Amino acid sequence: MNQASGLDLLKISYGKGARRKNRFKGSDGSTSSDTTSNSFVRQGSADSYTSRPSDSDVSLEEDREAVRREAERQAQAQLEKAKTKPVAFAVRTNVSYSAAHEDDVPVPGMAISFEAKDFLHVKEKFNNDWWIGRLVKEGCEIGFIPSPVKLENMRLQHEQRAKQGKFYSSKSGGNSSSSLGDIVPSSRKSTPPSSAIDIDATGLDAEENDIPANHRSPKPSANSVTSPHSKEKRMPFFKKTEHTPPYDVVPSMRPVVLVGPSLKGYEVTDMMQKALFDFLKHRFEGRISITRVTADISLAKRSVLNNPSKHAIIERSNTRSSLAEVQSEIERIFELARTLQLVVLDADTINHPAQLSKTSLAPIVVYVKISSPKVLQRLIKSRGKSQAKHLNVQMVAADKLAQCPPELFDVILDENQLEDACEHLADYLEAYWKATHPPSSNLPNPLLSRTLATSALPVSPTLASNSQGSQGDQRTDRSAPARSASQAEEEPCLEPAKKSQHRSSSSAPHHNHRSGTSRGLSRQETFDSETQESRDSAYVEPKEDYSHEHVDHYAPHRDHNHRDETHRSSDHRHRETRHRSRDMDREQDHNECNKQRSRHKSKDRYCDKDGEVISKKRNEAGEWNRDVYIRQ
């Protein structure tokens, strides 16, 4: 009995020892001593393999280096060829990119770094990861731009590294709590910061503020995880980051859009903007396209044009333009910009920079600003009762523009004199021209002649020439009954002078405005009787008015000269008597007296009316025309 119990105790102790020993076995059944010996053998074999590289490995490395050098040489040659190629398209960046640590650039050191909201001119595609182009800044040369595919891959790698870092840091933190409530907040915060999140930071704050406190910091319970309310709050945030591309395609030349000082369609705003259009046309002659846009291009938001489900909503609304018309106008603007000329839009419906902020146009917004509301109010009232009755609407629009932060505008023209404002705008556009036209790409653009022939609508110098023609016709009609033959002979001498003065004033219009704000603005009286039809006619050169006017005036002049030449030839040919020659002398003396009288009368007429213009309010368009084109 005692022996049997002793044997049982021995078996139990032996079994415990065996279990302890088995704890040190590996997963493959080997013991710890076996694994250590095996690891030593494997380590020795690896050392022996790497310490003696074969000849094939050396030749393979040399081949790789030769291939890399050849690819780099070809990339450099393609980069040089691209310098003279036209711009294929332009993009605005939504992310920032630094090429400092980039090691897979086709030509080392030739990658282009940029910040968010920069503009890039793309010449061509190099491969799936790189484009060839340049940053639109003065002094920046051509280089390699990361493609959207490469930027997306970089973003995914960054997110993956950030998630791994969060995971390892949470494991090493020693927090062994397995409650779902602790995991959910960390997973919410694990999304790494990206450019898309930075852009929509204000939207994110609004969403987080709307979330109740129990969802913002959930308790360790399963209910807070499966709450549909918290899921709904998270979904818009992830949608925003998902659909924000790194680049937005924009026109190759950013179109210039004028806003202010108040609403377009009213005389004060129209006359100031027309003066700037006139200046730009002649200052950048041969380098600028000024076109009128009547469609409501504020409807051309990327979210609307890219989403067919929203088209029906826009079509049913009471908008003045259809989406097809808007899309056509946007395409026309893009086509104009491909010529790399300055593009200026006379957009009837754009009165605020926010109207174009979500479109793909990326315009240069120029704010024509009147700093003092009292000055603007006085200008509106000086335009007559028809404009004064809309005073409140114009003042509210001006106030909304004044409340905008300066960052919404590219240029703010708040000078007191029109000439200074014109020079300010010209300096900005000259700098932009140099930024978009580097010295290395001076070849003519083949798209220029084709596009300008079909798309551009040039602006006439001002409406003044049209108004001058009509006023001149009215003055001619009023004075026609009292005009004698000698006065008809004299007037053609005045008309060529007016035409030459018109040309000189058109070539340098900014020299005509040297007064202060109120005077410089009141000189734009050509828009007193402006209607929609007259605004349309502003884009047609008024050559017909001059041609008809000259035909009417030169006809009697030619008849009179022909009559004189007939008398002289008959006198020379037939040798009339002395009595007849004496009669002709008296007739010529009479004509000379009439010439002097009519010249004196016309001089007094222009001087008197010019003097009246200085002293009066100049409410008629003809007075402003005469003041502009005579005073040089």
From Swiss-Prot:
Composition bias type Low complexity, residue spans: 27-37, 169-181
Xref: Pfam families: Guanylate_kin, VGCC_beta4Aa_N
Gene Ontology terms: cellular component: L-type voltage-gated calcium channel complex; photoreceptor ribbon synapse; presynapse
Residues found modified as Phosphoserine: 176, 179, 190, 522
Alphabetized UniProt keyword annotations: Calcium, Calcium channel, Calcium transport, Cell membrane, Ion channel, Ion transport, Membrane, Phosphoprotein, SH3 domain, Transport, Voltage-gated channel
Chain intervals for the UniProt region annotation (Disordered): 20-64, 162-233, 460-610
Biased composition (Basic residues): 570-581
Biased composition range(s): Basic and acidic residues: 532-569, 582-595
Topology with respect to the bilayer: Peripheral membrane protein
SH3 domain boundaries: 86-155
Gene Ontology MF, one: high voltage-gated calcium channel activity
Main location group: membrane
Tissue expression from the record: Predominantly expressed in heart, aorta and brain.
Post-translational modification, as annotated: Regulated through phosphorylation at Thr-526 by CaMK2D.
Compositional bias annotation for Polar residues: 38-57, 462-473
Site (Required for CaMK2D-binding): 521
Listed InterPro entries: CAB1-4_N_A-dom (IPR046937), CACNB2_SH3 (IPR035605), GK/Ca_channel_bsu (IPR008145), P-loop_NTPase (IPR027417), SH3-like_dom_sf (IPR036028), SH3_domain (IPR001452), VDCC_L_b2su (IPR005444), VDCC_L_bsu (IPR000584)
A GO BP entry: chemical synaptic transmission
Phosphothreonine PTM sites in chain numbering: 526
Localization in the cell: Cell membrane, Sarcolemma
Free-text function comment from the UniProt entry: Beta subunit of voltage-dependent calcium channels which contributes to the function of the calcium channel by increasing peak calcium current. Plays a role in shifting voltage dependencies of activation and inactivation of the channel. May modulate G protein inhibition. May contribute to beta-adrenergic augmentation of Ca(2+) influx in cardiomyocytes, thereby regulating increases in heart rate and contractile force. Involved in membrane targeting of the alpha-1 subunit CACNA1C.
Family: Belongs to the calcium channel beta subunit family.
Subunit structure as annotated in this protein's UniProt entry: Component of a calcium channel complex consisting of a pore-forming alpha subunit (CACNA1S) and the ancillary subunits CACNB1 or CACNB2, CACNG1 and CACNA2D1. The channel complex contains alpha, beta, gamma and delta subunits in a 1:1:1:1 ratio, i.e. it contains either CACNB1 or CACNB2. Interacts with CACNA1C. Interacts with RRAD; interaction may be involved in beta-adrenergic regulation of heart rate and contractile force. Interaction with RRAD regulates the trafficking of CACNA1C to the cell membrane. Interacts with TMIGD2. Interacts with CAMK2D. Interacts with CBARP. Interacts with CAMK2A.
Protein name: Voltage-dependent L-type calcium channel subunit beta-2
Organism per entry: Oryctolagus cuniculus (Rabbit)
Upper lineage: Eukaryota, Metazoa, Chordata, Craniata, Vertebrata
